[in-house]
Amino acid sequence: MTMIIRKYFSGIPTIGVLALTTEEITLLPIFLDKDDVNEVSEVLETKCLQTNIGGSSLVGSLSVANKYGLLLPKIVEDEELDRIKNFLKENNLDLNVEIIKSKNTALGNLILTNDKGALISPELKDFKKDIEDSLNVEVEIGTIAELPTVGSNAVVTNKGCLTHPLVEDDELEFLKSLFKVEYIGKGTANKGTTSVGACIIANSKGAVVGGDTTGPELLIIEDALGLI
């Protein structure tokens, strides 16, 4: 049974900048209390790790992952890297952990991926091969609604994709084909925020959306991600 819940992370509705999830794992900020961690784990049916990245709680903005790989920025600290690798090993997950040496460290804002494809910002074009090798999927370079922050302006799972509301229909078709998803749609979260990737973490089993998200927005999110 799929689940979707509204949630604040310590009062913050932009939970997508603070966390990332795949089908198997969820990375969450250290400041989150255990009850919230357990609730997220239950909704997404994932193993959760609380960590900083580069000393920052902006885990979702700074990293990106799918079932094959985890991409981290060059500012990741050794202790954090060891913590993440140990967590993966303890859970018998053999992911390609790759540090992307770009000066653009907000990888989660600049990469959109599921287990079937990835869209990366033109700002990361020099790292396309590294990203492709780690995530083990077809990688395309592009924008969403003409914005280079593709990870901030959409959210994708193995079932569906929700994009910035100004995406054109032909762009929707391109994204649907790239990510090989059954469902796709345009919408907002957190009372009209167009950067939906900053407001939502989701996989094929469930979604956690920012606490300011309205009922009508929630219906569109559920539909686009195939969670109904």
Swiss-Prot record:
Alphabetized SMART domains for the sequence: eIF6
One of the protein's GO biological processes: maturation of 5.8S rRNA
Keyword ATP-binding: no
GO terms assigned for molecular function: ribosome binding; translation initiation factor activity
Gene3D superfamilies xref list: L-arginine/glycine Amidinotransferase, Chain A (3.75.10.10)
CDD domains: IF6
Domain of life: Archaea
Claim: Translocase is one of the keywords in the record: no
Keywords: Initiation factor, Protein biosynthesis
One term under GO cellular component: cytosol
Task performed by this protein: Binds to the 50S ribosomal subunit and prevents its association with the 30S ribosomal subunit to form the 70S initiation complex.
Family, similarity comment: Belongs to the eIF-6 family.
Protein name per Swiss-Prot or TrEMBL: Translation initiation factor 6
Organism: Methanocaldococcus jannaschii (strain ATCC 43067 / DSM 2661 / JAL-1 / JCM 10045 / NBRC 100440)
Gene that this sequence comes from: eif6
